[in-house]
């Protein structure tokens, strides 16, 4: 799940450790993808269990694990030694993986100067690189209404903004619009400063930073802008000149939200998604 790139930096921050988003990109580039699980692939957790389960995964990737004692009374290496792999198609050998790289890719560009995240393992080959026309929405609900009303077509790029840590506030998961697009058979990318569930499939790009509510370029996009998504080359680009973005920024105002209490305090204190959406000390 792309939430890994949100929660691990936040946990590390509590220990005084900085875990940069670039590290996820570096590790993914050299980590083979060995189990093609639903919703990205054809296999379910029942298939994985029948193929040997987590002990079989540990056996495949034994070199990653130290020999610590577990609550089972066996060490990790003892679990690996006692495991069986019953289906090589479900738990692939390291030298014959589903993909040679891992499931997460970090994108950059004039829409996401600080970065954005996509679960690249869940993107079909024909959607890894595309250019489309922006359909811009200032909330998940507005995007859902447009999708369910039949106003989104292939060739569009759905832009959902003001759903980030500050803008939501709280960075909700955009599972509903991506599920609707998939269920309607639409191969349409969705980009957002919100986040996604592990159940998301397709070209769903989230965690765009800086988010729209902080004045990020995502908030400057207009209907009709052309957007290029190039996952293999880590690019997310709007075909809008720098001068035009500066001109738009001069008249930009975030939508007002009637916040009070904890949500207002949270929105004022939370960092960007790329930093783990952590609460800054006052």
Language model: regions and residue ranges:
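Catalytic or ion-coupling anion/metal-binding cores of large enzyme and transporter domains
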Residues: 1-211, 216-282
